[in-house]
From Swiss-Prot:
Sample GO molecular function, one term: large ribosomal subunit rRNA binding
A Pfam cross-reference name: Ribosomal_L14
Origin species: Desulfotalea psychrophila (strain LSv54 / DSM 12343)
Residues that span the membrane, as ranges: none
Underlying gene: rplN
Similarity section: Belongs to the universal ribosomal protein uL14 family.
Known partners and oligomeric status: Part of the 50S ribosomal subunit. Forms a cluster with proteins L3 and L19. In the 70S ribosome, L14 and L19 interact and together make contacts with the 16S rRNA in bridges B5 and B8.
Keyword RNA-binding: yes
Record GO biological process: translation
Gene3D superfamilies, A to Z: Ribosomal protein L14 (2.40.150.20)
Cellular component terms (Gene Ontology): cytosolic large ribosomal subunit
Protein name: Large ribosomal subunit protein uL14
Length: 122
């Protein structure tokens, strides 16, 4: 579960390393984001000479959460960290590579580009 002020790792090569969630999108009463939800983030750590800079405000999609997620077949999936992939203005990923596994729930949300770039889909 991701909420406002949660620090997430970045799972792509956009140049950002750590981001801070400043808003969960999806309605005025939506407090928590889980896998596949879009959030508004600000970049807290970035590598020099990259596509994104420290202080940039962007959208991102959550690809891994430490909180377990229940699937319809009664299995549970959880990861060691909270991670997100940075999105551009058109909703496409900013980076060209994805690091680490991503959850299968992204396919239902329509993030097929992220699914195809990921090395492993759990």
């Amino acid at each position: 579960m991701i909420q406002t002020e949660t620090v997430l790792n970045v799972a792509d090569n956009s140049g950002a390393k750590k981001v801070l969630c400043i808003r969960v999108l999806g309605g005025s009463r939506k407090r928590y984001a889980s896998i596949g939800d879009v959030i508004v983030v600000t970049v807290k750590e970035a590598i020099p000479h990259a596509k994104v800079k420290k202080g940039d405000v962007m959208k991102a999609v959550v690809v891994r959460t430490a909180k377990e997620n229940r699937r319809p077949d009664d299995t549970w999936v959880k990861f060691d960290e909270n991670a997100a992939v940075m999105l551009g203005a058109s909703g496409e990923p900013v980076g060209t590579r994805i690091f680490g596994p991503v959850a299968r729930e992204l396919r239902n949300q329509g993030f097929m580009k992220i699914i195809s770039l990921a090395p492993e889909v759990l």
